[in-house]
Curated annotation (Swiss-Prot):
GO MF terms held by the record: magnesium ion binding; phosphoglucomutase activity; phosphomannomutase activity
Residues with site note (Interacts with the biphosphorylated intermediate): R421
Keyword Phosphoprotein: yes
Role this protein plays: The phosphomannomutase activity produces a precursor for alginate polymerization. The alginate layer causes a mucoid phenotype and provides a protective barrier against host immune defenses and antibiotics. Also involved in core-LPS biosynthesis due to its phosphoglucomutase activity. Essential for biofilm production.
Record EC number: 5.4.2.2, 5.4.2.8
UniProt: Mg(2+) binding residues: S108, D242, D244, D246
Encoding gene per record: algC
Class of this enzyme: isomerase
Name recorded for this polypeptide: Phosphomannomutase/phosphoglucomutase
Amino acid sequence: MAHLVPAALPDSIFRAYDIRGVVGKTLHAETAYWIGRAIGAQSLAQGEPQVSVGRDGRLSGPMLVEQLIKGLVDAGCNVSDVGLVPTPALYYAANVLAGKSGVMLTGSHNPSDYNGFKIVIAGDTLANEQIQALLTRLKTNDLTLAQGRVEKVEILDRYFKQIVGDVKLAKKLKVVVDCGNGAAGVVAPQLIEALGCEVIPLFCEVDGNFPNHHPDPGKPENLEDLIAKVKETGADIGLAFDGDGDRVGVVTNTGSIVYPDRLLMLFAQDVLSRNPGAEIIFDVKCTRRLTPLIEQHGGRALMWKTGHSLIKKKMKQTGSLLAGEMSGHIFIKERWYGFDDGIYSAARLLEILSKTEQSAENLFAAFPNDISTPEINIDVTDEGKFSIIDALQRDADWGEANLTTIDGVRVDYANGWGLVRASNTTPVLVLRFEADSDAELQRIKDVFRTQLLRVEPELQLPF
């Protein structure tokens, strides 16, 4: 592996929040080696020779992680190999071990033939131009060559003990835990049991084939098994983790899905009860009901761009104690480290639930609600998605409304809102609508339809 083979490094795998590709097509053992070399050089340039490395349960993990570590060591880094862990445990390692850099080898919720790299350098989760800078290092051969070393480090036990020491339940709860055969299975069911819950496990054996359902709790069809098991067992709540455990999906005791922006309402209320005036960050896809709720409980609401690395950067800038996005990433800085952690978020949810006499269904039903659409995706090209958004920001006529253009165009009316933004990970436009009545929802959709077709008449719109 002395010579760099550019064919093993397609530009397409260097994405907005991570590096991700299809194993055997755009991602090979050699790719992992050179990515390790680039990350190592960048970490050293930022004064951080120590790098933690973890992997999820994908079948390609052992092969790729071996080469990733070899690349880091050849760059001159000292690697702490934390083994098969969920992503939050790797983020935890990059907070509590000597070094503040880390690489998680994970395909997250993508199909089983994908894998990828989530990267933290000197405490900062890489995004956008920082990820492109790694590709530039490789193309210009701006690399280091030295001999580092690798040691195996047990992090899960420490992660487990710290959460069990922090989160205290007031009563025993019956909880169904669906790990979707992802990496959360190595710690989540055991942890929730250690908190004092009765755990009914579903698909908690790590299996990179994902034989039961896709490990993406953001899609309702992947929660069907969980909902059925919650109803069948009379559980207090159901929890589902994505493939690498940095997101959590929630269903109530009656089987209703709790969408992440409503979960954030509960966390906001809880955190603000102890930290009046705290800032809470949420992404542009979240309900309009969140801002008034945060303000009513004495907090400051800040809407920001979608993307876990972008939210973490904003939290650091502002000193925010809590953030969340519609995809299910929840970031808790109060009593924790501020990274997205589906497992710790689940523990904090159980703590809140254990202290109330209300059922999960009644607890969430008390929050204001609107009629909303699921996420609507429209296929376009990668270039087209940005030019359409530019044209909408520049030329569209939305009527009497409040516009937010930090990430696409969000148009807030008196009784509802609509959003169109370019996905950072796929060649699609992402839309979402919410309103207080079906008629208003339809009216807002019609406005968006008219404006979209004005700037791009060829678009195939499903609404």
